Amino acid sequence: MTQAQTWSQRFEKALHPAIATFNASIGFDIELIEYDLTGSVAHAKMLVKTGIISPEEGEALVNGLETIREEYRQGQFNPGVDAEDIHFAVERRLTEIAGDVGKKLHTGRSRNDQVGTDTRLYLKDQIQQIRTQILEFQGVLLDLATNHVHTLIPGYTHLQRAQPLSLAHHLLAYVEMAHRDWERLGEVYQRVNTSPLGCGALAGTTFPIDRHYSAELLGFDRVYANSLDGVSDRDWAIEFLSASSLILVHLSRLSEEIIFWASQEFGFITLTDSCSTGSSIMPQKKNPDVPELVRGKTGRVFGHLQGLLVLMKGLPLAYNKDLQEDKEALFDAVKTVKGCLEAMTILLSQGMEFRPQRLAEAVAEDFSNATDVADYLATKGVPFREAYNLVGKVVRTCLESGKLLKDLTLDEWKSLHPEFDVDIYDAIAPLQVVAARNSYGGTGFEQVKSALQNARDRWEAAQS
């Protein structure tokens, strides 16, 4: 037999134990207990303000709820294995503490608007924490970029060396992605910050409640204008999962690059012992577990987004039990995003070191300065397309003779086109190749310094 639930008087027989277990959410929605208590305190105060319960009853309810909060924080709150959900567990314990007045707490409220309120309060809190983590991650990237303005790194397209870059420019690309993530979560927060409390099961209530007052107590900016929408809306959860997915897209892309950079084939970075592991059979190995796990965990959050979209697409108004499935997706996504941000921040600040000499060698041993040869001829009046075609022949000639562009003699250059002169060597030197790209947003050192300062100013403003 299972203990009677708040709704069980309608039924003649007890719920089958296996179905009770299947139906229960207490195993995961206990995550919401602090928010459930906060929402209930606000609801109790609203009931007093509107005269629905007496001040003495309201005081008893609030004191009882705060007692439960303290019990939970001290590890003394036991919801019981038979509790269907956290709402029932709290109400049962409240009635034990406050007596029959505890049964008045649910006046003018349904579990439908209650759980919607709890989950939004939870997510508001988590969004703020994640945004703080994003700023910490950005700060580490900015510090790295500051130290590597004049460090060169090969730039790639199609994973083929394309043009050399300032390493700071490369890192600042991720700063920009992180800033969009920070902004995007702020926009999601605005949608989450709407109170459904008082919407009831779906149609509102006959009690003279004050929804705006309870919303104000809970820090919501507004209330839902339609009770059906208030209890059935999960757009905000989908938006959060979408924003979380994009955060992890960016972390996963960086992780992929770090994995490449740490390989012997690239050798651009060295992994420190604090953020890498070894092999159980191959003693020479130092494995990039952190970026590999971030890359793998990204798929979890993608799955939660897809799962909630599929869950919602066929639901009629208003509340359906299917919506219970949104909690675990949200909880796991929050923990995954926070864990990945923390791990990547530690990895960038303590777990890897760039190898400037190896990076310089990589930039010097390829044809990533070929575009600059074409640009050189274009500045001499040669049409760019003609210059482009000529440089293709130059590269082919170098490949056939086993040379790099810098190895060609001036006579060889002139034999290819009379406009070539001794200044070609300066034009194709890696530092000059990078420095010359001073268009707005480019990798030129002056542009990078300016972009770095702008990004840091923006970062500092975001923390105020």
From Swiss-Prot:
Keyword Lyase part of the UniProt annotation: yes
Pathway as given in its UniProt record: Amino-acid biosynthesis; L-arginine biosynthesis; L-arginine from L-ornithine and carbamoyl phosphate: step 3/3
Documented activity regulation: Strongly inhibited by L-arginine. Inhibitory effects are lowered at pH 7.0 compared to those at pH 8.0. At 37 degrees Celsius and pH 7.5, activity decreases to 73% and 31% in the presence of 1 mM and 10 mM arginine, respectively. Activity also decreases to 84%, 93%, 82% and 85% in the presence of 10 mM sodium citrate, citrulline, asparatate and glutamate, respectively. Activity decreases to 96% in presence of 1 mM L-lysine.
MF terms (GO), sorted A to Z: argininosuccinate lyase activity
Transmembrane segments: none
Activity vs pH: Optimum pH is 8.0. Shows more than 40% enzymatic activity in terms of relative activity at pH 7.0-9.5.
Gene Ontology CC entries for this record: cytosol
SUPFAM superfamilies in the cross-refs: L-aspartase-like
Notes on temperature effects: Optimum temperature is 42 degrees Celsius. Shows more than 40% enzymatic activity in terms of relative activity at 20-50 degrees Celsius. Inactive above 55 degrees Celsius.
Enzyme Commission numbers on file: 4.3.2.1
GO biological process: arginine biosynthetic process via ornithine; L-arginine biosynthetic process
Domain of life: Bacteria
Coiled-coil intervals: none
Matches recorded under InterPro entries: Arg_succ_lyase_C, Argininosuccinate_lyase, Fumarase/histidase_N, Fumarate_lyase_CS, Fumarate_lyase_fam, Fumarate_lyase_N, L-Aspartase-like
UniProt keywords, alphabetically: Amino-acid biosynthesis, Arginine biosynthesis, Cytoplasm, Lyase
Catalytic reaction annotation: 2-(N(omega)-L-arginino)succinate = fumarate + L-arginine
EC top class named in words: lyase
Compartments where located: Cytoplasm
Role description: Catalyzes the last step of arginine biosynthesis, the conversion of argininosuccinate into L-arginine and fumarate.
Family classification: Belongs to the lyase 1 family. Argininosuccinate lyase subfamily.
Protein name: Argininosuccinate lyase
Protein's gene: argH
